[in-house]
């Protein structure tokens, strides 16, 4: 019984950490990465479609992304969607390829981005702790129903606390890597 709750908590904590990593990967550093454009949706036949489904995005050099749109008629819509995003990018069309140069980040912008990343990290830690609280509540309910002993409940809570510490450490490591990446240039 407690093992199932522990495994469920571990799975949910892992999802929290992955969601945090995905969130910070979208934050633009000075380096070109196709994941920067993951959040962009293009108006395609009346519905917002992710850019990745309509085009191939590759890194051309350290500061430029190249986008090859599958349907040429969509190029203007893709350009418009990139300009409308809050990424501050200005794409330029060159035949069949749309090039997106990434401007270098200013020191002030880097510091702002680090604040954003730290806020995301705190949200990640909070969501991991919420999973811990849910698991501990389930253990307390089992204890109240006399399905487990006090010793088993204490042991299970200690296991979940170790899991929590482990996953929070993963969030902190990802945060440190992203901060280093932001301050690199």
Swiss-Prot record:
Any GO CC annotation of this UniProt entry: cytosol
Gene Ontology molecular function terms on file: ribosomal large subunit binding
Pfam families, A to Z: RRF (PF01765)
One GO process term, biological-process aspect: cytoplasmic translational termination
InterPro entries cross-referenced by the UniProt entry: Ribosome_recyc_fac, Ribosome_recyc_fac_dom, RRF_sf
PANTHER family: MITOCHONDRIAL RIBOSOME RECYCLING FACTOR PSEUDO 1, RIBOSOME RECYCLING FACTOR
Function: Responsible for the release of ribosomes from messenger RNA at the termination of protein biosynthesis. May increase the efficiency of translation by recycling ribosomes from one round of translation to another.
Protein name: Ribosome-recycling factor
Source species: Pectobacterium atrosepticum (strain SCRI 1043 / ATCC BAA-672) (Erwinia carotovora subsp. atroseptica)
């Amino acid at each position: 019984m407690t093992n199932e709750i522990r495994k469920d908590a571990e799975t949910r904590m892992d999802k929290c950490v992955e969601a945090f990593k995905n969130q910070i990967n979208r934050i633009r550093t000075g380096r070109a990465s196709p994941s920067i454009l993951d959040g962009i949706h293009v108006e395609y036949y009346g519905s917002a479609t992710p850019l990745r489904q309509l085009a191939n995005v590759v890194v051309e050099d350290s500061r430029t992304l190249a986008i090859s749109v599958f349907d040429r008629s969509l190029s203007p819509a893709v350009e418009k969607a990139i300009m409308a995003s809050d990424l501050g990018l200005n794409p330029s069309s060159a035949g069949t390829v749309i090039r997106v140069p990434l401007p270098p980040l200013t020191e002030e912008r880097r510091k702002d981005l680090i604040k954003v990343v730290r806020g995301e990290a705190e949200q990640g830690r909070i969501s991991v702790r919420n999973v811990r609280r849910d698991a501990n509540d389930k253990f307390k309910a089992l204890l109240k129903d006399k399905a487990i002993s006090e010793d088993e409940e204490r042991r299970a809570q200690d296991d979940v606390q170790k899991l929590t510490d482990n996953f929070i450490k993963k969030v902190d490591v990802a945060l440190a890597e992203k901060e280093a990446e932001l301050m690199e240039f």
